[in-house]
UniProtKB/Swiss-Prot annotation:
Native source organism of the sequence: Prochlorococcus marinus (strain SARG / CCMP1375 / SS120)
Substrates-to-products reaction catalysed: reduced [plastocyanin] + hnu + oxidized [2Fe-2S]-[ferredoxin] = oxidized [plastocyanin] + reduced [2Fe-2S]-[ferredoxin]
Binding-site residues for [4Fe-4S] cluster, renumbered to this chain: C572, C581
Record: residues binding divinyl chlorophyll a B1: H667
Subcellular location: Cellular thylakoid membrane
Name by which UniProt lists this protein: Photosystem I P700 chlorophyll a apoprotein A2
Length: 747
């Protein structure tokens, strides 16, 4: 007889109800909970999944390359990137009538197509690709790589090729490998591509497989490198009248420090980018030789952490007022981190989340791809995309931090160290965060509501408008002169300015920072920015409060002292202990996700509206309407959704109709979430039992039976399903809104 799902949990496989299916899906990737799982097997399985993960990414990128080469207009687009709209792929749908077929036959295509808002065209163009054949070759190469990755994943699960537990826990070797090989060498390799292929192509010099060994990337070749005359590589950069992709204004420099933007492509100088990657690569290769491994030289992480202990009896930090000795503040930290995958994953997710949010900001403030800064819809889509991903990663960091406290934390090993002290002082941490959120919330909302009232009563001059003087000062210190704050780089005679002016060569940072359009990397800010900044701060601090409380209370609280024994996720256990709903560490993640979505919406609303106003030459709209809530609702949300609610109507359709339909459907998905979030298990169990009764008494329905007794989702599962609908609906609705409202104005 076939083994029932899930094979990894025989106890669950014997469950006679539909709970078997849902719990099986929920725990499929919780390898720690599987039958017969050892620590070594756990590490080996996770290692193998990395290859699968990389294979999925490779397939995804190959799919983009293949479909754009097959159905896109890449070769036409590169001839005029500013005016030809890039095509993502063709679309065919049996529901299409003549109206929508005509509306979506766009961008020079002969049949319905989707416009690309991914920025892939700009990326491939910038790195030197020019033909569909190159895109096809890239797709084929990646598919071959995917096959190798899948084979490698399978191979590393075979007994002879499974790495040992000691190999996984050799932190120093792992750090050296990741720093020097993965980060360092890949950065150097990317520098090589930029220098040998991308920079020559940007100067009208084709470099391909046919001539890459015979075309020198610099007239002097490697001579300046070996003679230590490295400055030669920075001499003769492209001129300010350089035309991207042609020899007009082209120089010979390959590593520069120009700053600012290429005037025609309005992107960072490729030679600056190459210099950046070279420096990053060298730094990481040095960093990858710092930790003790094969040769017995270098640091060990255990020594580094324990060197931070304050054992000196004269150290004021050593002894607390009550006489307790605090000198062992890092004892056990290395073992704790090195033996906890959840701790390591939490650190990785937090780091990657912060980096992803930084990418969102920098793709707009410091655009690195040629002409992408003028593709406003793509810029809006990429900002939104990266901020939403950053939100997920950062919430996940706290979630795995909480799982660490439940599953991996050892009180004896960590006695008296910083981890133990964080747990001891959690009430102070949580209550301070609570105080901060209340201060931010009451003050920010109070000012917004005050402004709404006075505007509604016809006295807009009575609004409370606070200039963000400290933020303006930071912009001025960095060189922005419009505020009249004469300090540092905004003062022509300051030591900072004189030092900057003494650097050899030309530099264009000040030109960029004082531009009058959206391409200045510091946009002018005023009272509307001040208010929304504090609204976002409220959202960030509230999200952090819920997540930090969830993690610090994950082992136990005054309400549930033995909470760790219940695991990471557990349902309410009724009124017996004063009601325990919303107290598991998983519930903290669940609750925080709503605040995280709230916050990320405010962040992307702010970025999008401010940029729309600048792009349309109507900066006053944001500055004047952004100081009260009705201004946001009326002049951003309502005004910009007009394109969406007119994508299709009784008089016909236009190219925005698919986004209009997605906008509507996104609202439906979002609203469906509340069905799971508001009505709980008992209602559904009673309904299911009634439906089963009706089914069994309907002769034709009895042709279909089931092995598992139908039961309602658990409270935790229903919350997950509800949150998923809420989140996906949020994405679909706002994604459609951003793309349609921006492309409806700018194409």
């Amino acid at each position: 007889m076939a083994t029932k799902f899930p094979s990894f949990n025989q106890g669950l496989a014997q469950d006679p109800t539909t709970r078997r299916i849902w719990y099986g899906i929920a725990t499929a990737h919780d390898f720690e909970s599987h039958d017969g799982m050892t620590e070594e097997q756990l590490y080996q399985k996770l290692f193998a999944t990395h290859f699968g993960h990389l294979a999925i990414i490779g397939l995804w990128v190959a799919g983009n390359l293949f479909h754009i080469a097959w159905q896109g207009n890449f070769e036409q687009w590169v001839t005029d990137p500013l005016h030809i709209r890039p095509i993502a792929h063709a679309i065919w749908d049996p529901h299409f009538g003549q109206g929508i077929t005509d509306a979506l036959t766009q961008a020079g295509a002969t049949s319905p197509v989707n416009i690309a808002y991914s920025g892939l065209y700009h990326w491939w163009y910038t790195i030197g690709m020019r033909t569909n054949a190159q895109l096809f070759q890239g797709a084929i190469f990646l598919n071959i790589l995917v096959c190798w990755l899948l084979f490698a994943g399978w191979l590393h699960l075979q007994p002879k090729f499974r790495p040992s537990l000691a190999w996984f826990k050799n932190a120093e070797a792992q750090l050296n490998h990741h720093l020097a090989v993965l980060f360092g060498f890949s950065s150097i390799a990317w520098t090589g591509h930029l220098v040998h292929v991308a920079i020559p192509e940007s100067r009208g010099q084709h470099v391909g497989w046919d001539n890459w060994l015979s075309v020198l990337p610099h007239p002097q070749g490697l001579a300046p490198f070996f003679s230590l005359n490295w400055g030669a590589y920075a001499q003769n950069p492209d001129s300010l009248d350089a035309v991207f992709g042609t020899s007009q204004g082209a120089g010979t420099a390959i590593f520069t420090f120009l700053g600012g933007l290429h005037p025609q492509s309005e992107s960072l100088w490729l030679t600056d980018i190459a210099h950046h990657h070279l420096a990053i690569g060298v730094m990481f290769i040095i960093a990858g030789h710092m930790y003790r491994n094969t040769f017995g030289i270098g640091h060990t992480l255990k020594e580094i952490t324990e060197a931070h202990n304050t054992d000196n009896p004269n150290d004021p930090h050593t002894t607390a007022k009550d006489g307790r000795h605090f000198g062992v503040n890092h004892n056990g930290i290395f073992e704790t981190v090195n033996n906890s995958l959840h701790f390591q994953l939490g650190l990785a997710l937090a780091s990657l989340g912060a980096a992803c949010s930084l990418v969102a900001q920098h793709m707009g403030a410091l655009p690195s791809y040629a002409f992408i800064a003028r593709d406003y819809t793509t810029q809006s889509a990429l900002y939104t995309h990266h901020q939403y991903i950053a939100m997920f990663l950062m919430v996940g960091a706290f979630s795995h931090g909480a799982i660490f406290f439940v599953r991996d934390y050892d009180p004896e090993l960590n006695k008296g160290n910083v981890l133990a002290r964080v747990l001891e002082t959690k009430e102070a941490l949580i209550s301070h965060l609570s105080w901060v959120t209340m201060l931010l919330g009451f003050h920010t909302l109070g000012i917004y509501v005050h402004n709404d009232v006075v505007v509604a009563f016809g006295n807009p001059e009575k609004q409370i408008l606070v200039e963000p003087v400290f933020a303006q000062a930071i912009q001025a210190f960095s060189g922005k002169v419009m505020y009249g704050i004469n300090a540092l780089l905004a003062n022509a005679n300051s030591s900072a300015t004189l030092a900057a002016n003494s650097m050899p060569g030309n530099h264009y940072w000040m030109d960029m920072i004082n531009r009058q359009d959206a391409l200045t990397n510091f946009l002018p800010i005023g009272p509307a920015d001040f208010l929304v900044h504090h609204a976002i701060a409220l959202g960030l601090h509230t999200t952090a409060l819920i997540l930090i409380k969830g993690a610090l209370d994950a082992r136990g609280s005054k309400l549930i002292p033995d909470k760790k024994d219940f695991g990471y996720a557990f349902p309410c256990d009724g009124p017996g202990r004063g009601g325990t709903c919303d107290s598991s560490a998983w519930d903290a993640t669940y609750l925080a996700m709503f605040w995280a979505l709230n916050t990320i919406a405010w962040i992307t609303f702010y970025w999008h509206w401010k940029h729309l106003a600048i792009w349309q030459g109507n900066v006053a709209q944001f500055n004047e309407s952004g100081t009260y809530l009705m201004g946001w609702f009326r002049d951003y949300l309502w005004l910009n959704s007009s394109q969406l609610i007119n994508g299709y109507n009784p008089f016909g359709v236009n190219a925005l109709s698919p986004w209009a339909w997605m906008f509507l459907f996104g609202h439906l998905i979002w609203a469906t979430g509340f069905m799971f979030l508001i009505s709980w298990r008992g209602y559904w169990q009673e309904l299911i039992e009634t439906l089963v009764w009706a089914h069994q008494r309907t002769p034709i329905a009895n042709l279909v039976g089931w092995r598992d007794k139908p039961v309602a989702l658990s409270i935790v599962q229903a919350r997950l399903v509800g949150l998923t609908h809420f989140t996906v609906g949020n994405f679909v609705t706002f994604g459609a809104f951003v793309i349609a409202s921006t492309s409806g104005k700018f194409g």
